[in-house]
Amino acid sequence: MSIGASNPASLLISLHDVSPLTLSECEQAVALLAELGIGASALTVLAIPHHEGGAPIDAHPPTIEFLRRLEADGARLVMHGLTHRMTGRAWSPLGFFRAHLFARGQGEFHASDAEEANRRLDEGIAILRRAGLERATHSFVPPAWLLSRAAREVVAERGFDFYELFNGIIHHGNRYARRVIGWGSLNPVEAIATAMYADLQTLSSNVDVRVAIHPADMRLPRQKRAIRRAVARLRSRMRPESYTTYLASQRRYLGAAAE
């Protein structure tokens, strides 16, 4: 957080959708970020326990090793849904836009009731624990940053260290780092539009910003170039931090302000 004029804003980079199905692309993303001076200790890494219902992390040693190595180097591991796949449909205009246009059916918790949300959280936690990734179970980011009202109540009651929505990181009832930059890689038009938006965001005021990188971004040379450009520009004036380090600094600041 840019607490004072002498303090740079925070650059919060998250690597989404790590699973056996995306391991190669995730390794590429980590390597790309390292070239830009973003080491593992400044990363927040989102792991899908049972991607698409057919790729459990605990049954794939290479993915486990990748995540453990990142954690050993200081990355913060986070549970990212269970399967990453939404069940059912959303019929309201806003719900349809969020679930089927923005998230493209990936908003796993967007239509969940409390029972389903609890079940998915319990199953995801069990898989990560079997994989020896206990720390990842202490925080949560829903796929596409979407939670139904019932799912949000469940997540809030679980007592996670933090959870994240599209409009910020929720920690002890407070919301932090509201700005987010990400890229879309579904088609050339989306890729160009999101790259242009990201470039514009890097020029705006010096506030804490989240940068979300997805495996699909590594499949398009255009998006890799856009990520390099945006991260290099932000890195030049901001402080890279994992969510853990960032939130600890917010607690210290709030505590000092209250004295």
Name each model feature, range by range:
Residues 11-15, 43-45, 77-80, 138-140, ...:
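Hydrophobic faces of well-ordered beta-strands that scaffold small-molecule active sites
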Residues 1-76:
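Active-site beta->alpha N-cap acidic-glycine motif
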Residues 92-112:
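Active-site gating loops and adjacent loop-to-helix segments of metal-dependent hydrolytic enzymes
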Residues 108-185, 223-224:
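Catalytic domains of cell-wall/extracellular-matrix polysaccharide-remodeling enzymes
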